[in-house]
Amino acid sequence: MFSENLKKCRKQKKLTQQNMADKLGITRPAYTAYELGSREPDYKTLINISNILDVSLDYLLKGESNEKVFQDEAKKVLNDPETFLAAKDGEVTDEILQAALEIITEQLKERRKSDK
């Protein structure tokens, strides 16, 4: 899955394998091995790839879009808001609740627009 997603994202950014290798500071054959699935990047390189291609690690590794990741996090917040919205001292402040409400409201507006 990673190798397929890597190749797809690189092509969407209109980058060559050589471009990617140069940006990562590795040889083209080393980069090509990532796309062929015969070699896996270390964690630092994986993060660099994610940044260069402007995609999440979840998308690169599992094919999950940022929207899917956001939805999963939103479900966690709705199911247990105190855990996910707590400030450092463990208290859920009015400001945190207001910010969460604004985010949810914006997401609902966007969803309604796309449903029309």
Swiss-Prot record:
One of its GO terms (molecular function) is DNA binding. CDD domains: HTH_XRE. Keywords: DNA-binding, Transcription, Transcription regulation. The keyword DNA-binding applies. Residues 17-36 bind DNA. It holds the Pfam family HTH_3. InterPro entries: Cro/C1-type_HTH (IPR001387), Lambda_DNA-bd_dom_sf (IPR010982). The keyword Repeat does not apply. Gene3D superfamilies: lambda repressor-like DNA-binding domains. This is Uncharacterized HTH-type transcriptional regulator YqaE. The lineage of its organism: Bacteria, Bacillati, Bacillota, Bacilli, Bacillales.
